Amino acid sequence: MSVVAAAVVPSSPMLVPDVATGAASELATLRVAADDAVARLTAAGAEVVVVLGSGPRAAYAHGSAGTFAGLGVPLRVSLGDDVGEPATLPLPLCIGAWLLARTRYAGLTAGVTVDGAWASPDVDVALLVVADGTACRTEKAPGAFDARAAAFDGHIAAALAHGDGAALRGLDAGLAAELHVGGLPALRALGALEGPWRAELLADDATHGVGSFVACWERA
């Protein structure tokens, strides 16, 4: 049993139109690419889709719920059917759950946040990685401008485009921290998966000064 396919999507809540409101059109291209990637992922025939994000290590079962209320939007999401569980999903997993709902995926779903290595369950898994690159691409970026950010994001994009797990594992953690790469643990967890992979980079963007990627990995 193994990870049979993976997709990477942005972790920005601005991907969700209800959150972005008047700025929703600014991420329209990323949103379309993310929908495409998730549709491919859910068609991979895995027994379970696992949504993976960065954060303190935790696991979330099918039916776990979350909300965007912390961003002023009373939008509730869940991993699979909403069975009324308390809203405990962290933001990256809320975004993953929202994207899965848009595809009308009705299969088994779970979630996990990682701060290091991740071991896949003993079933065939499709992995939805919710992660951004740097937050320093422009002066108005969340982390302000840093001239090193574009090159760092370029390394991420190249690794995603070529299914290069070693390149993801080798990303400089110290520099990533300086460039506010909150998605590094999730990207490294993806990189730790045994290949080879047939990969495609669907989007590479820096709207709002944040490195954002959409990619699909399938077993070669």
Regions found by a protein language model. Give the residues of each.
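Active-site beta-strand/loop microenvironment that shapes enzyme catalytic pockets
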Residues: 113-155
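Polyanion-binding loop/helix "lid" in catalytic or ligand-binding cores
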Residues: 37, 160-204
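Short, basic/aromatic-enriched C-terminal tail that caps enzymatic domains
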Residues: 208-220
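Cap/lid and interdomain-hinge subdomains that line or gate substrate/regulatory clefts
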Residues: 79-119
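Short Gly/Thr/Asp-enriched flexible loops that form oxyanion-binding sites at enzyme active sites
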Residues: 62-65, 96, 138-145
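A short aromatic-anchored loop/beta-hairpin motif
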Residues: 1-88
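Conserved beta strand-loop-helix elements of the APE1-like EEP
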Residues: 100-104, 184-195, 215-218
